[in-house]
Structures are given as C-alpha cells and as structure tokens.
Swiss-Prot record:
GO molecular function list: translation elongation factor activity
Pfam families: EFP, EFP_N, Elong-fact-P_C
Protein name per Swiss-Prot or TrEMBL: Elongation factor P-like protein
Originating species: Alcanivorax borkumensis (strain ATCC 700651 / DSM 11573 / NCIMB 13689 / SK2)
Family from the record: Belongs to the elongation factor P family.
Gene3D superfamilies, per database record: 2.30.30.30, Nucleic acid-binding proteins
GO annotation, biological process: peptide biosynthetic process
HAMAP family to which the protein is assigned, alphabetical: EFP
Gene Ontology CC annotation, any one: cytoplasm
Length: 188
C-alpha cells in the first residue's frame, strides 16, 4: 500500500481487481485551514479498457503493483504502433501512439536511457531519462545586438517539440532538454 501523496505518473494501482496505469496526477490544495490536499488521479486500464478517474486525500492508502523496468531502444513506427527493442534479450515491445503521446516529443532513434514499464509481461508505458539531447531544426536568427539580459526565443526541435532557448542558439545545434519540465537546460 502506498499513500496517495506518494503516487507518481506511470505507477500502477489496483482498484476493484483491475490494474490501472496512472497517466496524470493533479494536486489540489484547498484554501480552508485543516483541509486535506486532494490528488486527482487519471488512469487507464492496463492492456486496454475503461479509463479511471478518482480523487484521493493525501493520507489515503492505495494498492500499488510492482513494475519491472527494461532498458529499450526505439526501433521503428508501423502506423499508430511504435516498436521498441529490449537492449538485453532483443525482444520487441509494441506501444500505441495514444499511450505514449507525451513521451514521443523526446524520443529519437538515438535516445538512450529509455525504460519500458512492464506489469505481468505486458508493457504499459515508457519512463524517460531526466534529460535528452535533441537537434534544433528551426529558430529565428541570433541578434547581433544581444543584450546582457537573458532573453529567449522559441526553437523547434527534431521531434517537433518547441522550447524556449537563449538568443545565441542557432538551427543545427544540439541542446539538452529536461524531460519533466520540457525546458532547455544547456548546449549539448
């Protein structure tokens, strides 16, 4: 059993005998004194099926299921299916585009450190590394009179993700992006 305040995205919980993979958690802090913080959990059934949405108080106990993490490498796309290969035994895992839509903004064929999350031999999602290196494909030109203030501009990366970067970054450069915050960290 895990407290609701300790749940995180991609955890698997068991509710009424059904396994659900957490897709989103919203924290709601009430303004009244003594009121408990609420955690709104949105999840989808493992292996397909109904969606699940529930609110928990921070000290509520929730039944969680142990996940197995396997290092994988992105292999190829087949329609709406994304195929990843296990780095150890070379088995292939198929994930639907809708299940990994948020993670796709950070994954290229060169991305290292991606983990497949498995429950009872079925892959339910991906866990990304803390940061990834991506190529800048499009951005406005650098300004000659760049001031000492930290001004930023939008840059489109090779996965389609748009992040704010410092003015001195130009198209063709590699940048390191924080996957949790979706923000520029540094040049790579």
């Amino acid at each position: 059993m895990t407290r609701a305040s300790e749940l995180k995205k991609s955890d698997v919980i068991e509710v009424n005998g059904t396994l659900y993979a957490i897709r989103q958690i919203e924290v709601q802090s009430p303004s009244a004194r003594g009121a408990a913080t609420l955690y709104r959990v949105k999840a989808s059934a493992v292996g397909g099926g109904p969606k699940f949405e529930e609110r928990f108080k921070g000290d509520d106990d929730v039944a969680t299921v142990a996940l197995q993490r396997r290092a994988v490498q992105f292999s190829y796309v087949d329609g709406d299916d994304y195929i990843f290969m296990d780095n150890e035994d070379f088995s292939q895992y198929l994930l639907k585009q809708d299940d990994i839509r948020d993670e796709l903004a950070f994954i290229t064929e060169e991305t290292q450190g991606v983990l497949a999350l498995k429950v009872e031999e079925s892959v339910i999602g991906l866990e990304l590394p803390a940061s990834v290196v991506l190529d800048v494909t499009e951005t406005t030109p650098a300004m000659k009179a760049a001031s000492s203030s930290a001004r930023t501009k939008p840059a489109t990366l090779n996965t389609g993700l748009v992040v704010q970067v410092p003015e001195y970054i130009v198209a063709g450069e590699k940048v390191r992006v924080n996957t949790a915050e979706r923000k520029f960290m540094s040049r790579a």
